[in-house]
């Protein structure tokens, strides 16, 4: 049966192919907006996404925020999360950290891992709410127990430093390992340094280098800096001033705050030719966007 949809002069439409069923549907944006105004949450969420991504309509962050907010007010968790992030960053609306915290908290009540992690951060650093390390830890822990790798890292950090909870290096290592095993580069880098130094774990240069190199291949600035230290101090590898300078230079370019000082320190014991060689290697690494440079 053929259904005709008449479009008014102001109509915009989206053509979407359904690869599963081989169907082609035309969704009139005006029709979608009327449906959304009637309270259909899925359509409100869809319109928010369309305006956010420019799917068949011009990008419009204000309209995107408006439709996400309509769905969020009806309890839709994905919409609540998007509203919170837009308020936090001032996208499509005025920046409002306190309001962002409220919406993250609403989404967190459903157990949403992303929301729980954000609530934890806001409690930890006093963003949009007062600092409360105990609440931060509890929020992180709820997400960590559901295998959210970033939350696992934060739980580990707080246990390691005794923030909002008693220090517990044994449990901190467990959470660092869980986070690293899920690919969290912060956890890989820090855990790698623990293995190199034997902090909370048996000393293992092999395991330490494996973790730090893994983080470095993903472009982690602190891992670049740690590779510089590895070569400068000869931790599991022969000492090499050129490679130390190289990695300090790469870390500096990547935004690591103290790497420049280490690079300049390394240069004091190097010849001009060695410095030029290290700089050339660093430039080659930069052309690779600082990733996959471990072959040097």
Which role fits each region the language model picked out?
Residues 1-4:
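Sec-dependent N-terminal signal peptides
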Residues 7-49, 294:
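N-terminal leader/linker segments that initiate helical-solenoid repeat arrays
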Residues 20-23, 257-296:
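Terminal, low-structured helical/coil segments at or just beyond the last alpha-helical repeat
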Residues 23-30, 58-67, 94-106, 130-142, ...:
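Structural signature of tandem alpha-helical TPR/SEL1-like repeats
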Residues 37-40, 53-55, 60, 73-76, ...:
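Short helix-capping/linker turns of helical repeat alpha-solenoids
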Residues 46, 222-232, 238, 242-253:
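Short N-proximal segments of mature Sec-exported proteins
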Residues 46-53, 57, 82-89, 93, ...:
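Hydrophobic face of amphipathic alpha-helices that form TPR/SEL1-like repeat modules
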């Amino acid at each position: 049966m053929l259904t005709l949809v008449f479009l008014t002069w102001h109509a915009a439409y989206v053509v979407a192919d359904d690869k599963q069923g081989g169907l082609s549907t035309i969704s009139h944006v005006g029709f979608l907006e009327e449906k959304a105004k009637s309270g259909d949450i899925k359509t409100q969420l869809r319109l928010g996404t369309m305006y956010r991504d420019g799917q068949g309509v011009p990008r419009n962050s204000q309209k995107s925020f408006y439709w996400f907010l309509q769905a969020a007010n009806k309890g839709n968790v994905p919409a609540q999360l998007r509203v919170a992030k837009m308020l936090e960053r001032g996208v499509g609306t005025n920046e409002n950290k306190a309001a962002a915290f409220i919406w993250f908290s609403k989404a967190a009540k459903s157990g949403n891992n992303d929301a729980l992690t954000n609530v934890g951060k806001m409690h930890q650093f006093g963003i949009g709410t007062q600092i409360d390390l105990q609440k931060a830890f509890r929020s992180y822990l709820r997400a960590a127990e559901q295998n959210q790798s970033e939350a696992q890292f934060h739980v580990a950090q707080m246990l390691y430093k005794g923030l909002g909870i008693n220090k517990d290096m044994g449990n901190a290592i467990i959470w660092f390992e869980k986070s690293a095993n899920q690919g969290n580069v912060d956890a890989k880098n820090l855990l790698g340094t623990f293995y190199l130094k034997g902090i909370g774990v048996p000393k293992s240069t092999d395991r330490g280098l494996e973790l730090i190199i893994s983080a470095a291949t993903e472009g982690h600035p602190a891992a670049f800096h740690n590779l510089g230290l590895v070569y400068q101090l000869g931790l599991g590898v022969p000492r090499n001033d050129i490679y130390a300078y190289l990695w300090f230079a790469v870390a500096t370019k990547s935004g690591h705050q103290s790497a420049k000082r280490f690079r300049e320190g390394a240069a004091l014991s190097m010849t001009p030719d060695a410095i030029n060689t290290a700089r050339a290697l660093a430039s080659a690494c930069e052309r690779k966007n600082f990733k996959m440079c471990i072959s040097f």
